[in-house]
C-alpha cells in the first residue's frame, strides 16, 4: 500500500513538469506544403529542431494524394489534437482538402513520399531536413 501511495505521489509531482514541456503552439512557424500530382512543393522541407512548426498541407490536385513520413512523425512531438491524422505515419487528402499539423521536429534527415506506388515511381517524394 505504501509503495502505491509513493508511486501516486510521484505521478502527481511529475504531471506539472510534463505540462510545462509542451511547446507554445501559438508561436509556431507556419510552413505550406502543396501536394501536386506526382510532386510535393517544396521538394526539400527545411525546419528548425526543437522549434514548434505548423505544417499546412494542401491537395492541389484532381485526385486523392497522400503524404507519408513515418519516421519523421514518430521522431517529432506532434500536438496531441493532431496525432490522429498521422497515426500510421501519414495521411491522404481529397482534391482541394487542407490539413494543418503542429509539431516539434526532431533533428535529422527524413524522407517523405506518396502512399501510392505509381506516384512514388513518378517522383512524388520530398526530403525533410531538420537542423
Annotate the PLM regions.
Residues 43-67, 97-106, 110:
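Beta-strand cores of secreted/periplasmic/IMS beta-sandwich domains, seen most often
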Residues 22-52:
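N-terminal edge beta-strand
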Residues 73-82:
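Short aromatic-acidic-glycine turn motif
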Residues 15-19:
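Sec/Tat signal peptide C-region and signal peptidase I cleavage site
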Residues 20-25, 39, 88-131:
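Extracellular/periplasmic metallocenter environments
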Residues 37, 51, 59-61, 69-73, ...:
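A mature extracytoplasmic/lumenal domain signature
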Residues 35-43, 54, 84-89, 96:
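N-terminal post-signal-peptidase region of extra-cytosolic proteins
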Residues 4-14:
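Bacterial N-terminal signal peptides
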Amino acid at each position: 500500500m505504501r509503495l502505491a501511495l509513493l508511486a501516486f505521489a510521484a505521478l502527481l509531482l511529475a504531471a506539472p513538469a510534463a505540462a510545462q514541456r509542451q511547446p507554445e503552439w501559438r508561436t509556431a512557424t507556419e510552413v505550406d506544403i502543396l501536394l501536386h500530382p506526382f510532386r510535393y512543393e517544396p521538394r526539400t522541407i527545411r525546419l528548425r529542431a526543437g522549434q514548434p512548426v505548423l505544417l499546412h498541407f494542401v491537395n492541389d490536385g484532381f485526385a486523392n494524394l497522400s503524404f507519408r513520413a513515418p519516421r519523421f512523425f514518430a521522431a517529432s512531438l506532434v500536438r496531441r489534437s493532431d496525432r490522429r491524422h498521422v497515426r500510421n505515419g501519414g495521411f491522404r487528402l481529397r482534391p482541394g482538402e487542407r490539413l494543418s499539423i503542429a509539431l516539434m521536429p526532431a533533428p535529422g534527415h527524413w524522407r517523405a513520399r506518396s502512399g501510392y506506388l505509381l506516384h512514388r515511381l513518378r517522383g512524388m517524394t520530398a526530403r525533410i531536413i531538420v537542423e
